[in-house]
Swiss-Prot record:
<comment type="function">
    <text>Mitochondrial 3-hydroxy-3-methylglutaryl-CoA lyase that catalyzes a cation-dependent cleavage of (S)-3-hydroxy-3-methylglutaryl-CoA into acetyl-CoA and acetoacetate, a key step in ketogenesis. Terminal step in leucine catabolism. Ketone bodies (beta-hydroxybutyrate, acetoacetate and acetone) are essential as an alternative source of energy to glucose, as lipid precursors and as regulators of metabolism.</text>
</comment>
<keyword id="KW-0443">Lipid metabolism</keyword>
<keyword id="KW-1015">Disulfide bond</keyword>
<feature type="binding site">
    <location>
        <position position="41"/>
    </location>
    <ligand>
        <name>substrate</name>
    </ligand>
</feature>
<feature type="modified residue" description="N6-acetyllysine; alternate">
    <location>
        <position position="48"/>
    </location>
</feature>
<dbReference type="InterPro" id="IPR000891">
    <property type="entry name" value="PYR_CT"/>
</dbReference>
<dbReference type="GO" id="GO:0046951">
    <property type="term" value="P:ketone body biosynthetic process"/>
</dbReference>
<dbReference type="GO" id="GO:0006552">
    <property type="term" value="P:L-leucine catabolic process"/>
</dbReference>
<dbReference type="InterPro" id="IPR013785">
    <property type="entry name" value="Aldolase_TIM"/>
</dbReference>
<feature type="active site">
    <location>
        <position position="266"/>
    </location>
</feature>
<feature type="modified residue" description="N6-acetyllysine">
    <location>
        <position position="111"/>
    </location>
</feature>
<dbReference type="GO" id="GO:0005777">
    <property type="term" value="C:peroxisome"/>
</dbReference>
<feature type="binding site">
    <location>
        <position position="42"/>
    </location>
    <ligand>
        <name>a divalent metal cation</name>
    </ligand>
</feature>
<feature type="modified residue" description="N6-acetyllysine; alternate">
    <location>
        <position position="179"/>
    </location>
</feature>
<feature type="binding site">
    <location>
        <position position="233"/>
    </location>
    <ligand>
        <name>a divalent metal cation</name>
    </ligand>
</feature>
<feature type="modified residue" description="N6-succinyllysine; alternate">
    <location>
        <position position="179"/>
    </location>
</feature>
<dbReference type="Pfam" id="PF00682">
    <property type="entry name" value="HMGL-like"/>
</dbReference>
C-alpha cells in the first residue's frame, strides 16, 4: 500500500469566537459536558494490524494534553480473544497520569479485573447488553447470567474502592433481534445501577438509532435511573451520531462517549463508519456554548498522529475540513 501523504492540521480560524446558537427552541442544554474518550480502547481493539505499545502510549498522552478528563485506556481481556489489547499492562503503566484525569479500563471478567488492579487501574468498565441474542453470541450466556458474572467484579471493586462504569450495548437496535424495547434497556440499566455502577453508557452499537428512537429509549430509562448516572455512546453508521447525541443533550444527558478521529468500525455493518468522532463532538459543543475543557487544536493533532500511525484517513469531518491532505 502506498504511504499516505502527511496531513498538516491548519489552525481553526475563529474557533475562540464561535458564537453560541440560540437554544430557546431546543430545551435546556447542559452548561458542561464530560467527554469519555474511548479511542485507545474501543477505537483500536478491532484494528487488524497490531499498533505498537509506544504509539498507544503517545496517543493517550496527547489526548491527556488535549484536556480530555476521561480516557478509556485499554482492555484487560485475553490476548487470545483480542490480540490488539495484549499489551494492556504495559500501556496502563507506561502512560503519564495527569492530575484530574481518569484512565478507566475494560474488564470483562474477575480475572481481568484483578489484573487491572494489579497494574494500577483506579476505575474499570463492564459490558452488558439489552439483547439476549447479542449477549449469547458475544459472551455465550444469557443477560441474567451476565449479571452474575458482573456481580463478582462489582463486589471485588467495592472492596478495593474501585469505581465501575457500566455499558449497555444494543440500546437502540440489535444486529440479531432488530428493534429493542426501551423497557428492556431500562431494565438492564436499572440492574447495573442497583449493582453499583456509578455511571451507565447507553450504546447504539450498530448505529441504527435516530433522534426519535433515542428520545423514546431515554424517556424509559430516565424513569428508572437518575439522569446524572447516564451517558450515551453513538455510532455513526447511518450518519445519525451527532443528531442522536444532541437529542440526548436536550433531554439532560451531560456525559458523551466518543473516539478520536472516529476510530472504531461497526463489525456488523461492512465498511460502515463507527464511533462518533471526538473532534466533531467538541466542535458542536463549542458552537452551542457548552464547556468541554478540551483544546480542539491539540485534539486534532492527536487524531492526525494516530491516523498517520494507522496509515488511514480520519473519519472526523472537522479534521477533514481543517487539514490539507
Amino acid at each position: 500500500m502506498a504511504a499516505m501523504r502527511k496531513a498538516v492540521p491548519r489552525r481553526l480560524v475563529g474557533l475562540a469566537s464561535l458564537r453560541a446558537v440560540s437554544t430557546s427552541s431546543m430545551g435546556t442544554l447542559p452548561k458542561r459536558v464530560k467527554i469519555v474518550e474511548v479511542g485507545p480502547r474501543d477505537g483500536l481493539q478491532n484494528e487488524k494490524n497490531i499498533v505498537s505499545t509506544p504509539v498507544k502510549i503517545k496517543l493517550i498522552d496527547m489526548l491527556s494534553e488535549a484536556g480530555l478528563s476521561v480516557i478509556e485506556t485499554t482492555s484487560f481481556v485475553s490476548p487470545k480473544w483480542v490480540p490488539q489489547m495484549g499489551d494492556h499492562t504495559e500501556v496502563l503503566k507506561g502512560i503519564q497520569k495527569f492530575p484530574g484525569i481518569n484512565y478507566p479500563v475494560l474488564t470483562p471478567n474477575l480475572k481481568g479485573f484483578e489484573a487491572a488492579v494489579a497494574a494500577g487501574a483506579k476505575e474499570v468498565a463492564i459490558f452488558g447488553a439489552a439483547s439476549e441474542l447479542f449477549t449469547k453470541k458475544n459472551i455465550n450466556c444469557s443477560i441474567e447470567e451476565s449479571f452474575q458474572r458482573f456481580d463478582a467484579i462489582l463486589k471485588a471493586a467495592q472492596s478495593a474502592n474501585i469505581s465501575v462504569r457500566g455499558y449497555v450495548s444494543c440500546a437502540l437496535g440489535c444486529p440479531y433481534e432488530g428493534k429493542i424495547s426501551p423497557a428492556k434497556v431500562a431494565e438492564v440499566t436499572k440492574k447495573l445501577y442497583s449493582m453499583g455502577c456509578y455511571e451507565i453508557s447507553l450504546g447504539d452499537t450498530i448505529g441504527v438509532g435516530t433522534p426519535g428512537i433515542m428520545k423514546g429509549m431515554l424517556s424509559a430509562v430516565m424513569q428508572e435511573v437518575p439522569l446524572a448516572a447516564l451517558a450515551v455512546h453513538c455510532h455513526d453508521t447511518y450518519g445519525q451520531a451527532l443528531a442522536n447525541t444532541l437529542m440526548a443533550l436536550q433531554m439532560g444527558v451531560s456525559v458523551v462517549d466518543s473516539s478520536v478521529a472516529g476510530l472504531g468500525g461497526c463489525p456488523y455493518a461492512q465498511g460502515a463508519s463507527g464511533n462518533l468522532a471526538t473532534e466533531d463532538l467538541v466542535y458542536m459543543l463549542e458552537g452551542l456554548g457548552i464547556h468541554t475543557g478540551v483544546n480542539l487544536q491539540k485534539l486534532l493533532e492527536a487524531g492526525n498522529f494516530i491516523c498517520q500511525a494507522l496509515n488511514r484517513k480520519t473519519s472526523s469531518k472537522v479534521a477533514q475540513a481543517t487539514c490539507k491532505l
